[in-house]
């Protein structure tokens, strides 16, 4: 946690500085629009000069922070976005600087009446005939020359920094392209692995379908055999019913015969008994 917090703070500082720089650029652009108008006073020119210096200093601070981006743990696409925003801000600042220099050289600032009167009085009391307007112009030219030298040095430094940022951006892009290539290759490998897995699954499914087809064929044969057995059993049942009917008829006939036989036997026994009784009865009487 202690190592992570400073990193987040630095990254937030870069974003905050860029945001503030864009805001100051907007204010700088508004001031430039007032150059050559009725609001173009010496105070405005002084504010404009301070704004230039502050923006140049802020640009250097942001440049130093961006140089430390590769060592941060920010994703590369975020680093690239920050570098891109910085380049756009630098280009916008250089464009506004060029516009400001052209407008300042084309227009003279308006001197307030009280300050102009005081400068005229000082000029009249001066023995060498110093002209207030000319002295101010000379002073303004000296300040402009000093600022131009400062701006040229800053532009040279900015150009060197822009080259470094271009190299940094190219390195980031190459790293991102490499990451994208690795990511694409990883996706392709995963897709190929999935395709191979699908092919294996399809092969296994085909084998399972073949096994099911064989089982269905075997079951079909078994069903045919079962159907034959059922048919045979049905025939056997019908035959058994016929046999049972025959057996029932035979049993009924046999029962009738047995009854007749028993009746005949009883009649015979009764007749024999009567005969014996008569026979023995007659013999005993004699």
Swiss-Prot record:
The Low complexity compositionally biased stretches are: 114-160
Q: Where is the composition biased (Basic and acidic residues)?
A: 97-107
Major location, coarse class? membrane
What is its membrane topology? Single-pass membrane protein
**Compartments in which it is found:** Membrane
Checking Gene3D superfamilies in the record gives: 1.20.5.110, 1.20.58.70
Kindly give the PROSITE patterns that the UniProt entry links to this protein: T_SNARE
Q: Which InterPro entries match?
A: SNARE, Syntaxin, Syntaxin_N, T_SNARE_dom
GO cellular component, alphabetical, reads: endomembrane system; endosome; Golgi membrane; SNARE complex
**Sequence ranges on the Cytoplasmic membrane side:** 1-257
Q: Name one GO molecular function term.
A: SNAP receptor activity
**TM spans (from-to):** 258-278
Q: Which residues form the t-SNARE coiled-coil homology domain?
A: 185-247
- Chain segments carrying region Disordered: 97-160
Which protein family is it in?
Belongs to the syntaxin family.
Q: What protein name is recorded for this chain? A: Probable syntaxin-7B
Q: Which organism is it from?
A: Dictyostelium discoideum
């Amino acid at each position: 946690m202690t190592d992570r917090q400073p990193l987040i703070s630095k990254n937030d500082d870069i974003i905050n500085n860029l945001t503030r720089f864009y805001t100051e650029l907007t204010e700088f652009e508004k001031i430039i629009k007032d150059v050559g108008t009725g609001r173009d006073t010496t105070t405005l020119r002084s504010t404009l000069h301070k704004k230039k210096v502050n923006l140049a200093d802020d640009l250097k601070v942001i440049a130093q922070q961006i140089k430390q981006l590769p060592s941060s743990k920010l994703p590369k696409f975020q680093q690239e976005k920050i570098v891109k925003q910085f380049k756009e801000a630098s280009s916008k600042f250089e464009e506004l600087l060029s516009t400001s220099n052209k407008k300042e050289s084309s227009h003279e600032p308006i001197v307030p009446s009280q300050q102009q009167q005081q400068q005229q009085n000082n000029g009249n009391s001066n023995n060498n005939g110093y002209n207030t307007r000319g002295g101010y112009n000379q002073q303004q030219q000296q300040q402009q020359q000093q600022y131009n030298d400062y701006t040229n040095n800053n532009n040279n430094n900015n150009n060197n920094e822009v080259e470094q940022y271009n190299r940094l951006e190219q390195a980031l892009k190459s790293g991102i392209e490499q990451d994208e290539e690795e990511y694409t290759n990883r996706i392709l490998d995963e897709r190929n692995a999935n395709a191979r897995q699908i092919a294996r699954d399809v092969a296994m499914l085909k084998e399972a379908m073949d096994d099911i087809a064989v089982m269905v064929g075997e079951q079909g044969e078994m069903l045919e055999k079962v159907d034959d057995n059922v048919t045979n059993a049905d025939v056997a049942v019908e035959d058994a019913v016929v046999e049972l009917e025959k057996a029932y008829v035979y049993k009924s006939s046999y029962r009738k015969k047995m009854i007749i036989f028993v009746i005949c036997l009883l009649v015979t026994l009764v007749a024999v008994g009567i005969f014996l009784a008569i026979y023995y009865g007659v013999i005993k009487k004699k």
